[in-house]
Every structure is written in structure tokens, then in C-alpha cells.
Design a protein with these regions (language model features):
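Secreted/periplasmic proteins
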Residues: 1-105
């Protein structure tokens, strides 16, 4: 497994980020950069540069979820991903911390 760096993800294999976060409160009802409405149940992830709709699989403590890029962000230095509330709930990872991921399903 490779440790990820902030920036453009690479295809192939599992990667680990030290710090992934989630977002939602205060933004529900707003439009995302990819044309959806952010809700508590929207399954997706924000990334700074991946095309909208790109599938990303996240894995945490035996659970996994595959979600599309639905928004832009995160806007905190050193972070690559921001899960939506729906995605973090399904994954059991609604906090800031480490996670594994790979591009695709």
C-alpha cells in the first residue's frame, strides 16, 4: 500500500491518506460543483481536480463504499478527500482520520 500525497491521485492499487474528512452541516441544500444538491444522504466525495463522476472506493475497518466525485474540495491544506455525510455514515468514518482508497470500483 502506498501513502498518498495531496494532489492528483494515481490509478492502481490501494493508497492510504493520513487525514480524510467529511462535510455537510451548513451546506445542505446547496448545489455541488457537479450539479447535485447536497443532502444528508447524498453518496459522494469532494476532490479538487478529479472529473465529476469519477468513482473512488474507500475502505475502513472492514467496510467499503464506492462513490462518485460530486463536488470540489477539501479546502484544508494536506487533505485530498471530503466525504459527504451519506458516504461517511455508510463507511463508519464520520471524523477526521486515516483511510484507504483506490480509484474505480
Amino acid at each position: 500500500m502506498r501513502k498518498a500525497t495531496a494532489g492528483s491521485p494515481v490509478v492502481g492499487g490501494w493508497h492510504q491518506d493520513r487525514e480524510i474528512s467529511w462535510y455537510g452541516p451548513g451546506f445542505y441544500g446547496n448545489g455541488t460543483a457537479c450539479g447535485q444538491t447536497l443532502t444528508k444522504t447524498l453518496m459522494g466525495v469532494a476532490h479538487r481536480s478529479l472529473p465529476c463522476g469519477t468513482l473512488v472506493t474507500f475502505r475502513y475497518k472492514g467496510r467499503s463504499v464506492t462513490v462518485p466525485v460530486v463536488d470540489r474540495g477539501p479546502y484544508v491544506a494536506g487533505r485530498t478527500w471530503d466525504l459527504t455525510k451519506g458516504a461517511c455514515t455508510a463507511l463508519g468514518h464520520c471524523f477526521t482520520g486515516p483511510i484507504e482508497w483506490h480509484l474505480g470500483s
